[in-house]
A protein has these predicted regions:
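Catalytic cores of nucleotide-sugar-dependent glycosyltransferases that transfer UDP/GDP/TDP-activated
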Residues: 1-474
Length: 474
């Protein structure tokens, strides 16, 4: 019996002019940036650059693709984005693989024979439709473990295949190495491997194929565009996070059209208009440690300050490739419910609407700009786009010294790093130190914005990726 074909989703990404960065970059950097695109367009000669991942929304990979592909298209590159289809069993397994690659076994086991069968069957179901869309000679960028099993078929089809890993750990344990051993055979035929940090590169990969490209943010996206104080408040009122009438809750969409916030967040309680906010934005993911943030705030910040905590994440059923989220959210709500009322009322769990991705981005933007301190107390982190987003908005950030966060924050200059993310007292003391010292908060925020300006904006990422693709099609 033939394997049924998957329904591949093609994303509408539009185009954006690279010229908007001309005033951000110096003359020399702008020339190098624009020349890289010109060279690639010449070398591609009508071939397409494809990006393949497993979800259209709700995570850092989807955000990167949505914001960066339009620049390639605006520069004359035919770059596209498609999303594979998978069953609940597939996403249960790939979530497990994700945590194994961070050194954590959620169910205490390695990869089973049945899980491998589900994975390979899903890859087979998606291969046929992809080969009907993608031509020999095209370049295909496959993102994360969910797509690793597609490498061989696409390479045999005559494509230049890049496998892009957005996750990793600084010090791999045996669980991580076992996950590498399971995935490595799928990747042999890739033309290149891209990691976010040198420390994340796997053992036994062909070194000549390995490249390191750190992620970035785009300051012109809906999530990062400038918002004045009135717009911030209007957006947060329209989403029911702050009390009061909606006002003009407008924002600029990714395609340049005007948008308006119309949907409310699902909240445990509303935030007072004058509250000082400690904010973490993330998926409902155990590796982001929202439970640790909640407990650290309740035990060490709330009793010694007037601050409120907002834990913000996506509407719990909106992210297809992360089936653990409902259970983690329920656990958070149980922890909050058990707290004494005076502390409980200052902790807000907010599920943000996801039906309109630009609307969601506008709400996150407003929350980050409204926050007094932004935290990211991850137990593991590939890069941590929410850190760079808050830094760009000149917010003081308190975050774990893990993964790509350590690359972004210079401790004491552009944020504060917590050496042990499980040390709730140190976390609380760091947050209190910022809340209690306005000059320190301002200085850290200014240093944070400058750090992102110099190291983590889109042109650097786009130039490095464009040069890699150019080298493969020369």
């Amino acid at each position: 019996m033939a394997t049924p074909k998957a329904a591949i989703e093609t994303m509408d990404v539009g185009s954006s002019p690279i010229e908007r960065y001309q005033n951000v970059l110096g003359a020399e950097a702008w020339s190098e940036f624009s020349d890289a695109f010109s060279l690639l367009a010449e070398r591609l000669r009508g071939r397409v650059v494809w990006n393949v991942n497993s979800t259209p929304r709700g995570g850092g990979v989807a955000e990167l693709l949505a914001s960066l592909i339009p620049y390639s298209r605006g520069a004359g590159i035919d770059e596209r984005w498609v999303v594979i289809e998978g069953s609940r069993e597939f996403f249960d397994f790939t979530k497990k693989a994700h945590t194994l690659l961070h050194g954590v076994a959620p169910d205490g086991s390695d990869v089973t024979r049945e899980e491998r069968r589900v994975y390979e069957e899903t890859m087979q179901r998606n291969t046929g439709p992809l080969l009907e869309m993608i031509r020999p000679g095209d370049v295909v960028v496959l993102h994360d473990p969910q797509t690793a099993g597609l490498v061989a078929a696409l390479a045999a089809h005559g494509c230049q295949v890049i496998w892009r890993s957005h996750i990793g750990v600084d010090q791999p344990n045996e669980m991580v190495r076992n996950a590498w051993r399971w995935l490595r055979p799928y990747l042999v035929d890739a033309a290149a491997y891209v990691f976010s940090r040198r420390a994340y590169v796997w053992d036994e990969l062909e070194s000549a194929k390995v490249h390191v490209i750190a992620p970035c943010i785009d300051p012109f996206t809906t999530k990062n565009e400038d918002l004045d104080h009135a717009s911030v408040n209007a957006i947060l009122r329209a989403s029911r996070i702050l009390p009061g009438p909606d006002g003009e809750a407008t924002f600029l969409r990714q395609d340049g059209a005007a948008g308006r916030v119309r949907r409310a967040a699902i909240l445990s309680t509303t935030v007072p208009a004058d509250a000082r906010l400690v904010l973490q934005v993330s998926r409902w993911d155990r590796l982001k440690d929202p439970a640790g943030v909640l407990q650290g705030f309740a035990e060490h910040v709330a009793p010694r300050s007037d601050a409120w905590l907002v834990l913000a994440g996506p509407s719990v059923h909106a992210v297809d490739d992360d089936p653990e989220q409902p259970g983690i959210l329920a656990h958070l709500e149980a922890i909050r419910s058990a707290l004494d009322p005076p502390i409980r009322q200052r902790i807000v769990i907010a599920q943000l609407p996801m039906e309109d991705i630009d609307e969601n981005a506008a709400i996150v933007n407003a929350l980050q700009r409204r926050a007094y301190v932004v935290v990211q107390k991850s137990l593991a982190e590939g890069f941590g786009l929410t850190v760079a987003e808050a830094m760009w908005k000149a917010k003081p950030v308190v975050a774990s010294r893990v993964g790509g966060i350590e690359d972004q924050i210079e401790d004491g200059r552009s944020g504060i790093l917590i050496a042990d993310p499980r040390d709730l007292r140190s976390f609380g003391d760091a947050v209190l130190g910022v809340l209690a010292d306005e000059a320190k908060a301002r200085s850290l925020g200014q240093g944070a914005r400058l750090r992102v300006l110099r190291q983590f904006l889109a042109p650097r990422y786009l130039k490095e990726q464009t040069e890699l693709v150019s080298s493969l099609v020369a």
